Every structure is written in C-alpha cells, then in structure tokens.
Amino acid sequence: MNEGDVLVVGGTSDARALCRQLDAANVAYTLSVATPAGKALAGDIKGQVRCGRLEYGQMVAWLKENRTRWVIDASHPYAEMVSHNLLRACETAGVLLSRYQRPEQLSNLTHPLLYTARSIADACEIARRFGPRVLLTTGSKDLAVWRAGLAEKTLLARVLPVAEVIQRCSELGFGVGEIFALCGPFSADFNAAFYHQCRADVVITKASGAEGGYQEKVQPCLDAGIPCIVIARPTPLVTGDELLESQAAFAQRLSRWLAAAKE
C-alpha cells in the first residue's frame, strides 16, 4: 500500500482525527490541505501532507497519477465547492468517495432569538432588523460578501490569527477595533465575556457542531439577550453508507475497506 492509495481532504480537526485512525491501522495515506494553517494543524501525523488548493482537473490528475482507491472528504462542512469538485473528480476517476461530516447540533437549541438562515443573503436580511454592530464568527472566506450585504452595519470579524487573514480584513475596510484574531473553539464563559466586550447587537455563526463549539457559541449569546443567526449547512452530496457522521462510523468503514482490500 502506498501513500496515494488513500486521500484524506481537509484542514480540519476532524481530518486530523481520521488520520490518527489511519495511523493506528497502519494505513498509508496522503492528507491534502489548502493552506499552511491546515498543514500546521495536521501536527505529527504519519501520512504525507500536500499543501495547496486543487481544482477539479487537478484532482482528477492526482487521483489517476497516484492510483488512489479511496477518498475521504473531511473538508469544512461549508466548503461546498471542494466537496462538489471531489465528487465530480471521483466519479471521473472511478474512485470510492466517503464524506465525513460531524453532527451539526442545529436542533439541540430553540429560542425566540435564535434564527436559522439558509444562505448569507438570508442571514443579511435577518440581521438588518437588529442593531448596528454585527459580530461575524463565520470565518474569513466570505467577508467581502458580508461587507456588501450589510454595508450599512458595523461589522466585527472574529477570525483566525493568520497574517493573510488579517491582511484581507484590513483590505476590506475592517478597522483595528473590528478585527478579533483568535483561535477557538472557546468556552461558554469566554464567549459570554467576548460578546459583552465587543458590544454585539447580533451574532452570526455557523452550525459547526460540538467540535466547533456550537452550543458554547450560541447559548451565551441567547442568555445575554442577543439575537443569534445560524447559517445552516449545505445538504451533503454523499449519502447512504458513505456519509459518516462520527469517529466510530469512520472506524467501521475503515475496517470494511481494509477487509475488502485484502480480498
């Protein structure tokens, strides 16, 4: 078995946890991450790490060149384009594709101040009902879209403490008091103090699941009487037995894959 046989895609803590299982099973693999931050998060995994974004055509070429037999999409739940390209590439190259996606916990909380949005545009429409200070805990990728959609609001961005991210915030017009560069997940107490300190009138977040500290983000917001808008996840492109929603489910799928590989 070579390192191209299995490809794990994603610079997330979920992807790293899957790699640990592959390490424990002595499976050779490659972890593909998009950014240096994702590479750093991989830590001391045993597999090969490749860094850089792959478009559809590049994915197909990589899969064929490395004779890949199994792809595990552990990319961020909201990385729709990555998942879409992976699905197409695996179909083209004839490679098995599994999707690992943590449970979202969206139904665990209900509250009059908790709103669910299906898109950024939907979230912007809801946010316009509230005060001027909008705290975004949705990552840095779509900040330009938020800026355009909520031009009349004061946007506060909680983002990763990465130089290129802070530079992007600055280029989009975020001031010194509007950029909060922090690496989560955070405790409920931390978030409660943070919301108070930044004087947020409304908080916008994503259904990040337990690993992303979803309840620790949302509950303190609601307890403080602050409206919270949660952007729901896109519908998974992979369904059935290849949609894995826990580490235990992945362990079972890995066992079946190893058994089939020996036949």
UniProtKB/Swiss-Prot annotation:
It comes from the Bacteria. One of its GO terms (biological process) is cobalamin biosynthetic process. Keywords: Cobalamin biosynthesis, NAD, Oxidoreductase. It catalyses: Co-precorrin-6B + NAD(+) = Co-precorrin-6A + NADH + H(+). GO terms for molecular function: precorrin-6A reductase activity. PROSITE patterns: COBK_CBIJ (PS51014). Its EC number is 1.3.1.106. Pfam families: CbiJ (PF02571). Pathway: Cofactor biosynthesis; adenosylcobalamin biosynthesis; cob(II)yrinate a,c-diamide from sirohydrochlorin (anaerobic route): step 7/10. Catalyzes the reduction of the macrocycle of cobalt-precorrin-6A to cobalt-precorrin-6B. Belongs to the precorrin-6x reductase family. This is Cobalt-precorrin-6A reductase. It comes from Salmonella typhimurium (strain LT2 / SGSC1412 / ATCC 700720).
